[in-house]
Amino acid sequence: MSLKWMSVFLLMQLSCYFSSGSCGKVLVWPTEYSHWINMKTILEELVQRGHEVIVLTSSASILVNASKSSAIKLEVYPTSLTKNDLEDFFMKMFDRWTYSISKNTFWSYFSQLQELCWEYSDYNIKLCEDAVLNKKLMRKLQESKFDVLLADAVNPCGELLAELLNIPFLYSLRFSVGYTVEKNGGGFLFPPSYVPVVMSELSDQMIFMERIKNMIYMLYFDFWFQAYDLKKWDQFYSEVLGRPTTLFETMGKAEMWLIRTYWDFEFPRPFLPNVDFVGGLHCKPAKPLPKEMEEFVQSSGENGIVVFSLGSMISNMSEESANMIASALAQIPQKVLWRFDGKKPNTLGSNTRLYKWLPQNDLLGHPKTKAFITHGGTNGIYEAIYHGIPMVGIPLFADQHDNIAHMKAKGAALSVDIRTMSSRDLLNALKSVINDPIYKENIMKLSRIHHDQPVKPLDRAVFWIEFVMRHKGAKHLRVAAHNLTWIQYHSLDVIAFLLACVATMIFMITKCCLFCFRKLAKTGKKKKRD
């Protein structure tokens, strides 16, 4: 840690002693890439407020880097995996999900997707084993007396650490495949009649056939698809804790779920008291651009600029795709700033400049920005919402197709398919988003909704973490559904009992009627004989 950061940190620690004593110790179980970028914003704010934040990360971590100066402390534990192992896996997963997995049939697509998820699950369980079975590490964590643990629900293990350390924990989450974690671990409600299943790319305004599709998705994810190899995880958790348990049972003990979206993005749906939506917590006003970049932006005149970024994971775009995209960009009057780390396309126009990195938030907040070409990552979409910039989506994998579908449904974006799009498709989508005022109007409506919140998303996220620390949990917000079996939750035992009562009554009434009928019949016959 640099002298500068050490001084800042010591001042913050001293402020705790002279304050009301509310500063706490936060342990973090992180996730890589955009998940970490989002969570880091929360952690930096916690540090600003005087809390001690320690991130538990493996020696193979890609982004959580101990060499970078920060007031956030790192506890690095050894693992047999290497950074190259993880990078290679993520790149292969990205390529397979984006280009190789066929979308021709529902069954084939999700069967291959489950294989990918289970490979990811195997990496996660290895990292988890290396942490919780490290006796020296666990002893050190026990002695540190943490107040709370913050984890991303996509990567299991944080809840196991919290259980072993006997501390409350919270989740940060965008979504899990098919809402499997939210349903089974969080008890969330998703009525299929009007809440589209994630990855279905549907909106809340579904016609009859779309509701059928949504129901099929829901049944598939509820009864067939497993985002994790649950047998392995359940067995591992039971062995470590020394009692029979399951992954989802342990996840169900989360005090709060901080969902990284908001109602400017989500479709309205019911949610539980221990859920808060904090989408866009990383967004902030734009800062001035570097001098050379600002000069290029200003040279666009009244036509303005287009910002183009497909995120940090795409670094191997084919030459054919790059040329096709560059050709489309060359045909618009706007200047284009394209985040691209590859061979310069032959069709690159004079209006387009390539950059290995872009100050994306600052560009989207620039008054000359007319449109944003994005892969549909949640962080990028929220920066576009924050600054009111309409989008053209080129979704690649994970939640990106669904994110862009949400923006399309709200009239703030158009999308093209990277597998099938032509230069003409991209050009037409760009022209529509830039020239048709309805897209700007709709994104500005979402932007106004986002800014018109009683408490900022980041402040709400930090409030709930501090709340859990102050009260040693938030059990009063946790629904009793977590204590019920599947049969009890769906009231199947009650329904069975009531049906049995009705059946018994019908049986008894029938028997009584038959008895009376026989008596009357015998009486009638006797009178005839007399």
Swiss-Prot record:
Tissue specificity as recorded in UniProt: Expressed in various tissues including the liver, kidney, testis, uterus, placenta, mammary gland, adrenal gland, skin and prostate.
UniProt-annotated glycosylation sites, renumbered to this chain: N65, N316, N483
Catalytically driven reaction(s): glucuronate acceptor + UDP-alpha-D-glucuronate = acceptor beta-D-glucuronoside + UDP + H(+); 17alpha-estradiol + UDP-alpha-D-glucuronate = 17alpha-estradiol 3-O-(beta-D-glucuronate) + UDP + H(+); 17alpha-estradiol + UDP-alpha-D-glucuronate = 17alpha-estradiol 17-O-(beta-D-glucuronate) + UDP + H(+); 17beta-estradiol + UDP-alpha-D-glucuronate = 17beta-estradiol 17-O-(beta-D-glucuronate) + UDP + H(+)
Q: Which residues cross the membrane?
A: 495-515
Gene Ontology terms: biological process: estrogen metabolic process; steroid metabolic process; xenobiotic metabolic process
Instruction: Provide this UniProt record's keywords sorted from A to Z.
Output: Endoplasmic reticulum, Glycoprotein, Glycosyltransferase, Lipid metabolism, Membrane, Signal, Steroid metabolism, Transferase, Transmembrane, Transmembrane helix
Which PROSITE patterns does this entry report, sorted A to Z? UDPGT
> What EC identifiers does the entry list?
2.4.1.17
User: One Pfam family this chain carries?
Assistant: UDPGT
User: What enzyme class is recorded for this protein?
Assistant: transferase
Q: Where in the cell is it found?
A: Endoplasmic reticulum membrane
Name used for this protein in its record: UDP-glucuronosyltransferase 2B17
